[in-house]
Amino acid sequence: AINAKKNNSNILVVSKTYPTHSQSVQAQGGINAVLYEDEDSVETHIEDTYKASCKLSNKENIKLMCQNAKDTIFWLDSIGVPFNRTSNKRIAQRKFGGTKKIRTCYSSDYTGLKILHTLYDKCIYENIEFKNEYFFLDLIIKDNTCVGAVFYDIVNGEVKEILAKTTIIATGG
């Protein structure tokens, strides 16, 4: 939503809960990223992640995620996520389960909560609209093109259509 807003688009985020009530607030550990190449490598990060998935995950997806992790952490830092810092002001990292190297970036023991609140605050700052307590039912398809979605308004008990030029489904997990 934040990146789409850069194009001066009208953005609407629809959620079955309030944005700050998701399971992300429970995530404590942190996010793995190779920030400093002299101490770690993306290749080792890829190997660790693939091994931790019992070699069941798509290795190309893991590669893409690990290659983009550094930029993602620095972007989160730039919008205000309060990552812990070392004495020389670098983003602090700690060792976490299943890793050979120290690469987990964290915000005390509230990493998910801090990231979620920072992203939500950024959305509010960017005037991104939210419709909460809307349960997704179906996509609206016309001539093989998605033109929106149908939702159940949990509060009012009504079915509502929301039309859109672009529909993005981000289900988490």
Language model: regions and residue ranges:
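N-terminal Rossmann-like FAD-binding beta1-loop-alpha1 element of flavoenzymes
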Residues: 1-13
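Conserved N-terminal/central alpha/beta ligand/cofactor-binding core
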Residues: 15-147, 151-158
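Short hydrophobic core segments
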Residues: 161-172
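Hydrophobic/aromatic ligand-binding patch that stacks against planar heteroaromatic rings
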Residues: 3, 23-24, 167
